[in-house]
Amino acid sequence: MGNTSSERAALDRQGGHKTPRRDSSGGSKDGDRPKILMDSPEDADLFHSEEIKAPEKEEFLAWQHDLEVNDKAPAQARPTVFRWTGGGKEVYLSGSFNNWSKLPLTRSHNNFVAILDLPEGEHQYKFFVDGQWTHDPSEPVVTSQLGTVNNVIQVKKTDFEVFDALMVDSQKCSDVSELSSSPPGPYHQEPYISKPEERFKAPPILPPHLLQVILNKDTGISCDPALLPEPNHVMLNHLYALSIKDGVMVLSATHRYKKKYVTTLLYKPI
């Protein structure tokens, strides 16, 4: 009776509504709520949809990793070259660095190239060639548990130490005030005017060294007739012509190749 009176008093305080009792196992007298079984066919579509979205989830995590790295420490962007050598008509690049959006590549002869400024770290990417997703087997790859294969690239600071050093040197040498400049004074542009006495001058006399043509010299009896004597260095790289005989002009030139001298003859009919 004590319990009945206490329940009745509680009902009066709650407006006459009585909450359902629960047993020791947590069940309600009004009926148990439906439970989702792990192996029931009702949740098969749920797990199937999760398996389908797993690659997209992995790509999203890779993209999210790049965003977290950028938020933590804004690393310096480094020029990175992407090249596709597998042929095709239209090639696009997609990666974790651009939220897996398609970026067209520029055609260069038989290759497709793109240069992007990427922060330091690891980045995944793929190629979209003529409507098909593929990866470059000649570059490093990473494979997920579901078999998704992506190319991976490591952008390291050490790969650009030479360029950084050159940039520092160029900045140090940017001040050219200490360099020698042109002498002070006015500068003009005046055309050359030949003097009247220069017009009637005869051509200069041929230097005597060029008169000693090796083709005009007689070879000694003890020498090989196929070999010519060693020419003087002033005779090199000059064109010599023989007087025209029987309608044929003969031209010759001597060149030096290391320690050897080669004389070439050209016969031209006229």
UniProtKB/Swiss-Prot annotation:
Belongs to the 5'-AMP-activated protein kinase beta subunit family. One of its GO terms (biological process) is fatty acid biosynthetic process. Non-catalytic subunit of AMP-activated protein kinase (AMPK), an energy sensor protein kinase that plays a key role in regulating cellular energy metabolism. In response to reduction of intracellular ATP levels, AMPK activates energy-producing pathways and inhibits energy-consuming processes: inhibits protein, carbohydrate and lipid biosynthesis, as well as cell growth and proliferation. AMPK acts via direct phosphorylation of metabolic enzymes, and by longer-term effects via phosphorylation of transcription regulators. Residues 1-44 are annotated as: Disordered. It comes from Bos taurus (Bovine). The glycogen-binding domain may target AMPK to glycogen so that other factors like glycogen-bound debranching enzyme or protein phosphatases can directly affect AMPK activity. Transmembrane segments: none annotated. The modification Phosphothreonine is found at T4, T19, T148. This is 5'-AMP-activated protein kinase subunit beta-1. Phosphorylated when associated with the catalytic subunit (PRKAA1 or PRKAA2). Phosphorylated by ULK1; leading to negatively regulate AMPK activity and suggesting the existence of a regulatory feedback loop between ULK1 and AMPK. InterPro entries: AMPK1_CBM (IPR032640), ASC_dom (IPR006828), ASC_dom_sf (IPR037256), CRP1_MDG1_kinase (IPR050827), Ig-like_fold (IPR013783), Ig_E-set (IPR014756). The modification Phosphoserine is found at S5, S6, S24, S25, S40, S96, S101, S108, S182.
